[in-house]
């Protein structure tokens, strides 16, 4: 009987289930969207039941499309939107809506904590204190949901990020992995345990926290009434860490960039915890008794800038048009676009920066804006990778996400980085990473070496730009960024 691995890829707006065979081919896929809820300005929530319903329907659809029986699934891996915070009872029933990573309701609370404890928190967790991470969201829930803290003190409340909630629903086991725990701002990434001092600062009772396990081990088995089979759930990693694993980024210095609405860049730093003033330090995964660390840079707006060309100023009808427009020009002709719609992320961390288009003349047309937008994505990526290179040597960039289909962008990325850019055959690297972690735990795949042999290159983009052109273009970009920074303060918005 042929066996397969099922990957659950739970994102911010949809839940997917993807079935892979031993050669990493996709043989079945199900995907269902679920809504976000906005009870107040700046607040973002999910209904955990809607997440579960979408995820379970996706599993059923993937099995049907693959014509695979549940008994043929050798293992299940889970990957998820990180930081999103859920509290539920011991029956798995949610006690409030999930507070999503994007939610800013705790921003003021975190600013107060940051002033007093910022350096200590970064030293323990690798994270710059922010409302983005789980700790303040969980504190808000305990402080504001009537009766929740009392129930928590009695042992009637469980906390988890989305992976924990899904695994609990599937197996009844209350667990998470190192990569997801490292995004809560409650986990000591050196000691590899929940940190008592941080729990005290945020007022979190330790009894509600999940057990932290490796990213590849059997956490439990699916309840038979769910799928008609007891399947091991044996892989777990946050979405960006799973993408690095799916790119076979196992060696120190290996880097992946995921180009989505925003972009996330992770560099494997091996067994060493490395700190950067302008990047986050995180755990990539735990495997075979060892933890691998990573540096992470998040870029707030990349693909969203292309969406703005389409939906905002309507100079294109579909994203793919940008490549054709950009290649009509020999150069950017001095036009730069800094897409700081919501400020700038790594390495600038300027929440007051705003979008800027500069260098416009009477001859500027939509092709200039299209090219400037694609180039901006590449410049922003170089900004992050330059920070990473201060701490770890980088030879190439492995890429995934929708924008990697744009050959102009990928070539310009290679040119401006002066590093080769590698696009793999399988684009679903996040789901694939979770599948690999699950499969390794049950010997479906035997080793990292076997996984490396499965990772196939679709296209390599070699740098072809001369050094002087590269220097001039990047200098222009840095000058444009300077002019965009702090603009919201200047105009008082």
Curated annotation (Swiss-Prot):
Which residues bind ATP per the record? Answer: 12-14, 261, 303, 307, 402
Q: Name one GO biological process term.
A: glycerol metabolic process
Q: Where is the signal peptide?
A: none
Cellular component GO terms, alphabetical: cytosol
* Single annotated GO MF: ATP binding
Q: What are its E.C. numbers?
A: 2.7.1.30
Q: Has keyword Protease? A: no
Q: Which reaction does it catalyse?
A: glycerol + ATP = sn-glycerol 3-phosphate + ADP + H(+)
Identify which top EC class this enzyme belongs to. transferase
PROSITE patterns assigned: FGGY_KINASES_1, FGGY_KINASES_2
State the name under which the record lists this protein: Glycerol kinase
**Whose protein is this, by species?**
Thermococcus gammatolerans (strain DSM 15229 / JCM 11827 / EJ3)
Q: Which gene encodes it?
A: glpK
